[in-house]
Amino acid sequence: MALERSDVEKIAHLARLGLNDADIPRTTEALNSILGLVDQMQAVDTTGIEPLAHPLEATQRLREDAVTERNRRDTYQAIAPAVQDGLYLVPKVIE
């Protein structure tokens, strides 16, 4: 699947990227190259191959899950600009 100029323009718009006309051909080529690599990887037969979570068979030593600090929620919320029902109120950032 090859991307066309209109596809790249739409992707740039959705990603809120400001691409100028000079950048679009280079970006189209780069994205098509990435998609070509994805196509190559999808074509590989992985039947019988167990998924790999980590290349090393090492495990981490885990500490006991215990509270190590006191709850300072009230202290932090006292200096917050806006709090309601124990939650921080922030400006809306998504339209």
Swiss-Prot record:
The keyword Iron-sulfur does not apply. Coiled coil: none annotated. It comes from the Bacteria. It catalyses: L-glutamyl-tRNA(Gln) + L-glutamine + ATP + H2O = L-glutaminyl-tRNA(Gln) + L-glutamate + ADP + phosphate + H(+); L-aspartyl-tRNA(Asn) + L-glutamine + ATP + H2O = L-asparaginyl-tRNA(Asn) + L-glutamate + ADP + phosphate + 2 H(+). One of its GO terms (biological process) is translation. Pfam families: GatC (PF02686). Allows the formation of correctly charged Asn-tRNA(Asn) or Gln-tRNA(Gln) through the transamidation of misacylated Asp-tRNA(Asn) or Glu-tRNA(Gln) in organisms which lack either or both of asparaginyl-tRNA or glutaminyl-tRNA synthetases. The reaction takes place in the presence of glutamine and ATP through an activated phospho-Asp-tRNA(Asn) or phospho-Glu-tRNA(Gln). Heterotrimer of A, B and C subunits. Belongs to the GatC family. This is Aspartyl/glutamyl-tRNA(Asn/Gln) amidotransferase subunit C. It comes from Pseudomonas syringae pv. tomato (strain ATCC BAA-871 / DC3000).
